[in-house]
Amino acid sequence: MIIGLHGHSGVGKNAAARLLTKQGFTTFALTAPIRRTLLLLDPRLEQGWTLSSLVEEQGWTGALRHPLYGNEVRRLMVALGRGMRQDFGDNVLIDPIDRAIAAMSNGTQANIVVTDIRLPHEAEWVISRGGLIISIQRDGATPASEDVTERPLPPALVSFTITGT
């Protein structure tokens, strides 16, 4: 079973994934290659900070929510993700997870949760493997940016919606 989690930044996708992990699911994030690449590049932020120093101190969630640097960290992630998809194809972030699932399942059905389904083709990938998409919404949560990755998925791709406060 593959469960893909969809929703704005900060609505609780990672918290939901942690609950599923306690039930035997393995967690994957489509953004993992983006984050690894950005840490290798280690861009400079303002006031002597680098991305790696910010992430080391705050974690990725803290870096993305940081009052001074959060918008820039998000902009870097979005730009790199867009560039990777343009240069290497829409599946550039999906393929590593596909390979990992194939390696770990060994012919059996693995229980997988993907924490960051943002685009229709990502949701279609989950569904094509017999999975489902859960949209997580929270009162007052708004998109972190105007980027296409912050738009809701088409309703036909969403199996369930969880709404919290």
Give the positions of each predicted feature.
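Post-Walker A helix-loop "phosphate-sensing" segment adjacent to the P-loop in P-loop NTPases
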Residues: 21-28, 43-46
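ATP-dependent small-molecule kinase phosphotransfer cores
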Residues: 32-109
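Short active-site oxyanion
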Residues: 23-26, 110-112, 132
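Hydrophobic anchor at the beta1->P-loop junction of P-loop NTPases
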Residues: 5, 114
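Conserved lysine of the Walker
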Residues: 13
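Hydrophobic positions on the alpha1 helix immediately C-terminal to the Walker A/P-loop
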Residues: 16
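Small-molecule kinase domains that catalyze NTP-dependent phosphoryl transfer to phosphate-bearing small molecules
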Residues: 6-9, 120-129, 135-165
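Extreme N-terminal starter segment of soluble prokaryotic enzymes
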Residues: 1-3
